[in-house]
Amino acid sequence: STLNVLRYSSLAAGIVYGAYHTYTLKLEGEKKQELYDYQKKLKLVEAAKAEYRKLNPPKQAASTEAVNLDDPEFDFGKFILGAVEKLGS
């Protein structure tokens, strides 16, 4: 009788442990799969950004010239026409 109690108690403990172990392995696998999917999405986003940069290169910034309005030889009309010309192109 005592032997049967020990036998069935061991069987029940083994079943509970097996269920717990299976559950933890399943959770670990799901976490690894989520991480893998996330890394894959990051790689796709980086590839898309690189392709966008390749297809649409950044525009060159217009050079800024130092303008001294107090200079007596400064031609304001020429400066304005040059600025309008730069905006038009």
Swiss-Prot record:
The modification N-acetylserine is found at residue 1. It is a single-pass membrane protein. It is found in: Mitochondrion inner membrane. One of its GO terms (biological process) is proton motive force-driven ATP synthesis. Keywords: Acetylation, ATP synthesis, CF(0), Hydrogen ion transport, Ion transport, Membrane, Mitochondrion, Mitochondrion inner membrane, Transmembrane, Transmembrane helix, Transport. One of its GO terms (cellular component) is mitochondrial inner membrane. The chain crosses the membrane at residues 8-25. One of its GO terms (molecular function) is proton transmembrane transporter activity. Pfam families: ATP-synt_E (PF05680). F-type ATP synthases have 2 components, the catalytic core F(1) and the membrane-embedded component F(0), linked together by a central stalk and a peripheral stalk. The central stalk, also called rotor shaft, is often seen as part of F(1). The peripheral stalk is seen as part of F(0). F(0) contains the membrane channel next to the rotor. F-type ATP synthases form dimers but each monomer functions independently in ATP generation. Belongs to the ATPase e subunit family. Mitochondrial membrane ATP synthase (F(1)F(0) ATP synthase or Complex V) produces ATP from ADP in the presence of a proton gradient across the membrane which is generated by electron transport complexes of the respiratory chain. F-type ATP synthases consist of two structural domains, F(1) - containing the extramembraneous catalytic core, and F(0) - containing the membrane proton channel, linked together by a central stalk and a peripheral stalk. This is ATP synthase subunit e, mitochondrial. The lineage of its organism: Eukaryota, Fungi, Dikarya, Ascomycota, Saccharomycotina.
